[in-house]
Amino acid sequence: MRGPDRRPRGARLGAVLAVSWRRGGGDPDNDNGWQKALDAVHERYEATGVAQVTRTGPLFRLLRRQSNGTFTGVLLDKGPPDYLVASGPFVFRAEAKNTNRPRLPLSMLEDHQAGSLDRWEEQDPRNVGLLLLRMFPARLAWAVLWRDVRLYWWRWHDGPTPTPTGTASLTPATLDSIGIPISPAAPDWLDRVRLDLASECTTGQRR
């Protein structure tokens, strides 16, 4: 099922929003504790040559530089998913999400992010959409292939209002069934996801 591509309207794209951005600090709208843990793992991937990792962010125009590596800019558009990871035959476009709730709200993934992951996978069979998820209080984390969660997301997105009970979020049990559990402190996801994909390619079954 493919839902509509609901991109922001043109008037919103031109809106001026002053933001402060620290080099290497990540998107201030996201939980830096989770992204810093992911960044540390990704730096190791780069250092050992197992993957090339690009940290992406929203488009903006620089207005002025400030002290301590920060600057103020104008936000031009909503950004793509957080990471682009090339490893072996696969190229992953990954979005990181952290929640402090006992269930993962599907609304955390925005329309433009879901649309980007859909288009990414449609372009090439080697392209893989991925969500890197953490529930902070429960100390749980998962790597979830977009194709395994997209049905939940589009069903919620295109469903009736008010949302039926239990359909607007995912429980840890559901994430255990559709995702790959990883360490919330040292989220080394690449080998396990590649093994899962390789097993499916050779046997037709998921590990």
Regions from the PLM with identified roles:
Residues T54-R55, R93, L130-L133:
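A structural signal for short, well-ordered beta-strand segments and their strand-loop junctions
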Residues D118-L151:
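Nucleic-acid nuclease catalytic cores
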Residues Y83-V85, P89-R101:
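Conserved catalytic cores of phosphodiester-cleaving nucleases, focusing on short active-site segments
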Residues T99-Q123:
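Mg2+/Mn2+-dependent nuclease catalytic core
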Residues R2-V16, W21, L170-R207:
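Charged phosphate-binding loop/patch that engages nucleotide di/tri-phosphates or the phosphate backbone
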Residues V144-T167:
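Short, electropositive alpha-helical surface patch
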Residues M1-V74, T203-Q205:
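Acidic-basic catalytic patches of nuclease active cores, encompassing PD-(D/E)XK
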Residues L76-P80, S87-V91, H112, D124-R126:
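Short connector loops at helix/strand junctions that flank enzyme active sites
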